[in-house]
Amino acid sequence: SDGVKGILYASQISSGEENNLNIRVFGTQGSLQWFQENPNELIFKKADAPQQVYRRGNGYVGAAAQGATRTPFAHPEGFIEAFANIYRGAATAIADQIAGRKAPKGGYDFPNIDDGVAGMAFIQSAVKSGKAGAKWVKFPRT
């Protein structure tokens, strides 16, 4: 959000693709890539070095990633567990509220009302763009 510009390409009906959700971020010094069909890996490609593949469940991942991992590395984990992480975060927030505990530094790791409002604004902007012939439309910041 420091004035960096990007492009979002999204399609729910790409011919020949079954699901293939992927996120790729490209910068001047390298890129990050994640593919839902291979969800346990994050690929880091530096412009001047061989690519690095980070796999979930290993000791080199951060504390947040370790906390969201339920099975040892090389064992499958994925879609259903992602929802379990959201529910666990919500349950922790409720338990903390009941016990009078403060939220952890950085807040809780689950979507809140602001995330929901931003998601709805995105959907409305996508519909508006579609009705305008796939033209760029202003995305309201919430």
Regions found by a protein language model. Give the residues of each.
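Rossmann-like dinucleotide-binding domain that binds NAD(P)(H)
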Residues: 1-20, 24, 114
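C-terminal glycine/acidic-rich active-site capping loop/insertion
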Residues: 1-2, 29-110, 114
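Short catalytic/ligand-binding loop motif for oxyanion handling, primarily in non-cytosolic enzymes
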Residues: 17, 33, 119
